[in-house]
């Protein structure tokens, strides 16, 4: 479940492919604009925030399509996305990623940081994990958090944005199946 191939499939399936049709397209990013607006507003819908999120997500889709829609059919398949990650991210640090990836990572952090304190603590990590997978025991999630975080992270109250960015970069660019970043999104399942 922690192979690089599965991790990239996981990102496509659970982070971007919001409409669950097996590929990325403009509709996924329109849906992400609504989702992000509601998450940021904690259920309240702000037309101004939505307009801003729509602009961000449209720009993000356009950039991802430019980087990954190799056959220019308006859809980015899992294989195309993997090729784009290999070309633009593999072996690179977060600071070297294309803007589209950076924007998405920052937005993902904002969505997980439910209380807005600038850190992702264990409680927020748990909430994020249960949105994508089913767990019979919370210990599975807590064990993954312990593998992900360092003592310094835990003393600080959780993952800062900078630390999250670094871990996300490792998650999609580091082929090592035992790196701590493999647990960024909790215990992973094999993506079919």
From Swiss-Prot:
Name the UniProt record assigns to this protein: Sarcoplasmic calcium-binding protein, alpha-B and -A chains
Pfam family, one: EF-hand_5
Miscellaneous comment as given in the Swiss-Prot or TrEMBL entry: The sarcoplasmic calcium-binding proteins are abundant in the muscle of arthropods, mollusks, annelids, and protochordates.
All residue ranges annotated as the EF-hand domain in the record: 4-39, 56-91, 100-135, 136-171
Ligand binding (Ca(2+) 2): 69, 71, 73, 75, 80
UniProt-listed SUPFAM superfamilies: EF-hand (SSF47473)
GO MF annotation terms: calcium ion binding
PTM annotation (N-acetylalanine): residues: 1
Function as written in the Swiss-Prot or TrEMBL entry: Like parvalbumins, SCPs seem to be more abundant in fast contracting muscles, but no functional relationship can be established from this distribution.
Residues that, per the record, bind Ca(2+) 1: 17, 19, 21, 28
Organism this protein belongs to: Penaeus sp. (Penoeid shrimp)
Subunit structure of this chain's protein: SCPs from crayfish, lobster, and shrimp are polymorphic dimers; three isotypes (alpha-alpha, alpha-beta, and beta-beta) have been identified.
Keywords attached to this entry: Acetylation, Calcium, Metal-binding, Muscle protein, Repeat
Residues annotated as binding Ca(2+) 3: 113, 115, 117, 119, 124
């Amino acid at each position: 479940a922690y192979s690089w191939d599965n991790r990239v499939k996981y990102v496509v399936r659970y982070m971007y492919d919001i409409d669950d049709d097996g590929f990325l397209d403009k509709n996924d990013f329109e849906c992400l604009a609504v989702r992000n607006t509601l998450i940021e507003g904690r259920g309240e819908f702000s037309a101004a925030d939505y307009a801003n999120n729509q602009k961000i997500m449209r720009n993000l889709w356009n950039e991802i399509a430019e980087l990954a829609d190799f056959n220019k059919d308006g859809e980015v398949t899992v294989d195309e996305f993997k090729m784009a990650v290999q070309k633009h991210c593999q072996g690179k640090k977060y600071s070297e990623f294309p803007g589209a990836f950076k924007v998405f990572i920052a937005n993902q952090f904002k969505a997980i940081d439910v209380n807005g304190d600038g850190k992702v603590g264990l409680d927020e990590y748990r909430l994020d994990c249960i949105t994508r997978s089913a767990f019979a025991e919370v210990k599975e999630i807590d064990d993954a958090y312990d593998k992900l975080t360092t003592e310094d992270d835990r003393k600080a109250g959780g993952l800062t944005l900078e630390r999250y960015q670094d871990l996300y970069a490792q998650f999609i660019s580091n082929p090592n199946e035992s790196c701590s970043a493999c647990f960024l999104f909790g215990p992973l399942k094999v993506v079919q």
